[in-house]
């Protein structure tokens, strides 16, 4: 029985290893890796005249993951096609009880005529359930090829310096959700900082309540158009403390 059990465990470990390193290309395909779910998330693919995208895990352990996504999209130049992302799995947590959200993110992008962002995407709601979301907070490490955030006016409302980076802050509605987007003034391919500092800024300066719950924390890329593109995340980590 011990031999059989060990054999079964080795078989499962081998299968898991292969699964983690196999790219997936379906619209809603996912892979669980460490503390994350990695999503292909081709939610806007119908806005493209042609294209495809595949995503895969390179390595993962606990709160650290390395991954990549490759895509080509044509048509619908003003529309996002997808949001391949690594989503941290956690229970919704009230902002007032969070002391820090340390994160590191090292990435590179290659391809032709890329219009895309590289961004954290986080949601705040009145309860720990994501269905109560009222705010979407995006932190753009890059706005490539003229990509731009949701904005009511097209103008910045502030230019704060947070975690040693100067950001253009925009706001606007997305349905019933208010979106705040911090867009780095220069592309930041090697980020290390405390994501809680963005929430502290919004609480102190934009009237966001610290009684709200952080319900979602994702990091990935939103492509508009481009060809033979690849986002390669060599290092990503995040935790809520």
From Swiss-Prot:
GO terms for biological process: cell wall organization; polysaccharide catabolic process. Disulfide bonds: none annotated. One of its GO terms (cellular component) is extracellular region. It comes from the Eukaryota. Optimum temperature is between 50 and 60 degrees Celsius. GO terms for molecular function: cellulase activity; xyloglucan-specific endo-beta-1,4-glucanase activity. Optimum pH is 5.0. Residues 1-16 form the signal peptide. Keywords: Carbohydrate metabolism, Cell wall biogenesis/degradation, Glycoprotein, Glycosidase, Hydrolase, Polysaccharide degradation, Secreted, Signal. Its EC number is 3.2.1.151. It is an enzyme of class 3 (hydrolase). Glycans are attached at residue 47. It catalyses: xyloglucan + H2O = xyloglucan oligosaccharides. InterPro entries: ConA-like_dom_sf (IPR013320), GH11/12 (IPR013319), GH12 (IPR002594). It is found in: Secreted. Belongs to the glycosyl hydrolase 12 (cellulase H) family. Catalyzes endohydrolysis of 1,4-beta-D-glucosidic linkages in xyloglucan with retention of the beta-configuration of the glycosyl residues. Specific for xyloglucan and does not hydrolyze other cell wall components. This is Xyloglucan-specific endo-beta-1,4-glucanase A. It comes from Aspergillus niger. The gene is xgeA.
């Amino acid at each position: 029985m011990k031999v059989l059990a060990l054999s079964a465990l080795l078989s499962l470990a081998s299968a898991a290893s292969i699964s983690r390193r196999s790219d997936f290309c379906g619209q809603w395909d996912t892979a669980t890796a460490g503390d994350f779910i990695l999503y292909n998330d081709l939610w806007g693919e119908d806005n493209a005249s042609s294209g495809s995208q595949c995503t895969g895990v390179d390595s993962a352990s606990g709160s650290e993951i390395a991954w990549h996504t490759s895509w080509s999209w044509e048509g619908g130049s003003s529309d996002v096609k997808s949001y391949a992302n690594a989503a941290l799995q956690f229970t919704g947590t009230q902002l007032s009880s969070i002391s820090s959200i340390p994160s590191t993110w090292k990435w590179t992008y290659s391809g032709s005529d890329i219009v895309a962002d590289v961004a954290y995407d986080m949601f705040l709601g009145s309860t720990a359930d994501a269905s109560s979301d009222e705010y979407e907070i995006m932190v753009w490490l890059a706005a490539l090829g003229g990509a731009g955030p949701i904005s009511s006016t097209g103008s910045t409302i502030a230019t704060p310096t947070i975690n040693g980076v100067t950001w253009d802050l925009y706001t606007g509605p997305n349905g019933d959700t208010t979106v705040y987007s911090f867009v780095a003034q220069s592309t930041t391919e090697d980020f290390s900082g405390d994501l809680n500092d963005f929430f502290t800024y919004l609480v102190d300066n934009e009237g966001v309540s610290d009684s709200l719950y952080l319900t979602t924390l994702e990091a990935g890329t939103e492509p508009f158009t481009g060809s033979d593109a690849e986002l390669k995340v060599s290092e990503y980590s995040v935790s809520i403390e």
